Design a protein with these regions (language model features):
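Conserved acidic segment of CheY-like receiver
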Residues: 4-17, 21-25
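Short hydrophobic/Thr-rich beta-strand motif most characteristic of the beta2 strand and flanking loop
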Residues: 30-38, 46, 190
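Active-site residues of response regulator receiver
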Residues: 58-59, 86
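Short, flexible helix-to-coil linker/hinge segments that flank and couple to helix-turn-helix
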Residues: 92-99, 103-152, 205-208
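Basic, Lys/Arg-enriched C-terminal extension of HTH/homeodomain DNA-binding domains
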Residues: 186-213
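Recognition helix of helix-turn-helix DNA-binding domains
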Residues: 162-195
Length: 213
């Protein structure tokens, strides 16, 4: 009896990377690539059409983020399996992906080493987080998380705004902004405002697109 191959779908903005994934998958007798999406909205639509066994996707997709794609699909298809493939190593990125419903999180530069085993494991209901990713989680596992308001304040700092402007934009007092900044520096073990922004971006607490907006 011939085994039915795993039906795989990919979602990534970069055509060269998608082509690489397609080449790897095509060499496997137990896997078949059924769809490729280039943005978040297309990913959602193609998933509903093809119902793949495992979806490989990046965090950052135009139109709708990869994490939103996962959350929306999980809402309608609780048993859907997702494996995130990305360049982002921050612990906050990983935590958000797992919370959204991803079962695995791989860095793109480790795909050749871990991809096939991870796909098979995720399909069987297991989680796959390689040591390169897990080490970041472990490093900050006891760190106190920033509150939503603290992230708002730090985002304003990242855009170069002074305390008075931040206070006006968030409808709070300058003293409150200063208190938030004191907490932020302490939680991130940062030396100053710039250092805090750098740490937050590296860890994925602040998103680059949000900083630029």
């Amino acid at each position: 009896m011939v085994a039915i191959p795993l039906r795989i779908m990919t979602a990534d903005a970069h055509p060269v990377f998608r082509e690489g994934l397609a080449a790897i998958l095509s060499a496997q007798s137990d896997m078949a690539l059924v769809a490729e999406a280039t943005d978040g909205n297309q990913a959602l639509s193609l998933f509903r059409k093809h119902r793949p066994d495992v979806m490989l996707l990046d965090i950052y997709l135009s139109g709708m983020s990869g994490l939103d794609v996962i959350a929306k699909i999980k809402n309608d298809f609780p048993n859907a399996r997702f494996l995130v493939l990305t360049t982002h190593t921050g612990d906050a990125h990983v935590q958000r992906a797992l919370k959204a419903g991803a079962s695995g999180y791989l860095l793109k530069n480790t795909v050749r080493r871990y991809l096939l085993e991870s796909i098979r494991a995720v399909h069987h209901g297991q989680r796959r987080i390689p040591s390169e990713v897990a080490s970041n989680l472990v490093e900050y596992i006891t760190a106190e998380a920033l509150t939503a308001r603290e992230i708002q304040v730090l985002g304003q700092v990242a855009n170069g705004n002074a305390n008075k402007i931040i206070a006006d934009r968030l409808s709070i007092s300058e003293d409150t902004v200063k208190a938030h900044m004191k907490n932020i520096l302490s939680k991130l073990a940062a030396n100053d405002r710039t250092h805090a922004v750098t740490i937050a971006i590296r860890r994925g607490i602040l998103e680059l697109d949000a900083v630029a907006s």
